[in-house]
From Swiss-Prot:
Glycans are attached at N38, N81, N132, N217, N273, N303, N441, N612. Disulfide bonds join C87-C739, C95-C699, C151-C414, C624-C751. It comes from Caenorhabditis elegans. The chain crosses the membrane at residues 5-27. One of its GO terms (biological process) is protein processing. The lineage of its organism: Eukaryota, Metazoa, Ecdysozoa, Nematoda, Chromadorea. This is Neprilysin-1. It is found in: Membrane. The keyword Membrane applies. Its cofactor is Zn(2+). The active site is at E588, D653 (proton donor). Residues 63-754 form the Peptidase M13 domain. Its main location: membrane. It is a single-pass type II membrane protein.
Amino acid sequence: MYTRFGPPIVFLISCYALILCGTVDALPRAPYFNDDINKTTTTSEDKTVGNTVVEEEKKTYTVGDSEGYQEASRLLQKSLNLSLDPCDDFFEYACRAWVDSHPIPDDLTSYSQFTATREKVLAEMRKLYEDNTSIPTSKSIALIKQIYNTCMDTEKHNAVGARDLLEKIKTYGYWPMVHNEKWRESTFDLTKLLSNTIQSRDVSVFFDFGPAEDSRNVSRRLLSFDQGSLGLGYSTRDYYLDEKKYEKQMKAYRKYTIGKVRYYTEDAGMAVNESKIESDVDEIIAFEKEWAQILVAEEDRRNYTKLYNVRRFDDLKEYMSIIDWKKLTLSTTPFLVHSYLKTNPSIIISDVEYLQKMNTLLQNTDPRIVTNYILLRWAGSWSQEIGKKYEDLQQEFAFQMYGRKQRQPRWKDCVSSAGGKLSYASGSMYVRKYFDANAKNTTLDMITDLQEAFRNMMHANDWMDAETKKYALEKADQMLKQIGYPDFILNDEKLDDWYKGLEGAPEDSFSQLVEKSIQWRNNFYYRRLLEPVNRFEFISSAAVVNAFYSPTRNAIAFPAGILQQPFFDARFPKALNYGGIGAVIGHEITHGFDDTGRQFDNVGNLRDWWDNTTSSKFNERTQCIIEQYADVKLRGTDLRINGKLTQGENIADNGGIKQAFKAYKSYLEKHGGQEARLPQFESLTNEQLFFVGYAQVWCGAKTPETKTLLLLTDPHSPETARVNTVLTNQPEFAEAFKCPAGSPMNPTKRCVVW
């Protein structure tokens, strides 16, 4: 698989939550307990939480009163509703108060603990970009601040509008639906048109192609070719294939597209013919519907052996003859790699049949429609640069499509845009100002604990044969650990060397800086076709609130952005940290052994290392997960989870919390059997607090429109299932809260893979 975004080009099958992936400093180990947390000794009586007895025996325990414990208590007071029965619906018990007190902001389509933390990081990055008290010593940091500042120049964007965009299109041979008779079909050249859109904005539309690690030999990179994405985004084919069911969304898409073309036509100084614009847009959507029938659904693209088809470069003309592939690649890659491309190198094609079908569709489609569509998609890459009236149109569409009530502040767009262009530079700024370096070692300690828990789970496993189990243990032991950030980003000289060749002139506009950064990035990664892969290269920006697993590196990554509340705080009870970041760590470790991660070996090569009988048993267990989640209906709707699409994330969720709980219990055994309880929550045992901590990560809500979209496109299950369905599979949860057998949170049937 190939992605053009992120620091290194690396195949990531997992991130802990959707967002629309070093070495560890030798720091002293952080203490597990502060000296002042064990203050008050209390004898408990039988207590209840809701209708559930949580203390049956008199026990002596302590209540912590440190600053960290007090803060953790205050946070939970805003989340838990202790009047509810945790055995009925744990999400409601652990999250209802938080959800009720944190309505979705008007400029967002969802709001959760994850979102709140991301919003915090965005605001922190804004402060850094807008801080003019000192001159940056790094050229890269100076450049990223220039990108932010030019992005924020809305007065200039409104004054220029779509003028630069339209002037550039003239050099491409005009836009039929905008320039009408100025476009000539006789001049249509698909290869040249795509060459222009890729060179300037990296818009290839019908396919993704570029350097990617060779899944069978991850020490090298090959050119990789994969299917493209529709106008509504990846995995949105269902909207086009069932227009009756998704009538609201498709009407909004049509209206939005018509509005944009109307504005483009006006800005080009051409006469607006409303009926002609509507006809052109209808032709485009009809074309997309045909294309949607060719695209393979993501849930059917989970066998990576089937997606690994090695061919020679010259074979492309056999599969997709409508494009001159040699001309296209030579015109969009740096001169340094031209000799390599002329050797007819090996390439990887994810789906040969897709290229063949796409070739037929393009050959049978009016060139006017193809040109209109490509330029419409290309123009979409200018959305932040062409002024308020286009942004207002986009907001109308976002309200219908995603339920977003108002456009987000400009500064959020610009923070995201700048960070996306120079992600290591943004990470450098964030780490220097906001990251506690001690968190790296504390996290490493927890990873060690989680890996030990996984090994113990593997040893206790009774369905794997000895040889497969032995190799699984080796893979777990050899998993690379990347925490916080790569060290080089804190060295100005090394950071600037990474971005060598990327420079902005003082007079550059935002659009010019965008194109320079895109062209630099593509040149940078294409040159890597000639270099061996550095398996140890950090796979994420530091200023990211997420976690990742890369199967082709067998690496887990925890950027600096996620190593904070509510996932982690060294001052909090370990129950909350193991339930929070501990479950995140376990989730990523488990991804190495989910339905897709298990297809790769200890160094990341695509290789079947499973005994056939053991593989069959794994598939049986996975099928249980698929069917279990497919039976989950979202509250208040008739929508159900796609169990096949979400199976990998569900396996990781279930395995991750099991590892985290075992690691926490092991920690308690090593430290006296219990830790101090939280003030105001003395009734919660250590084990119960662990599960509360796990649930906190997923407290949140989405608009109805976004729920629909994510059920179709997101490989993660909704928050309620990431709490309730996961915990129903954990007998330790039912034991901790003493849930009666047969109660909603203690069912008679459970699904367990790991």
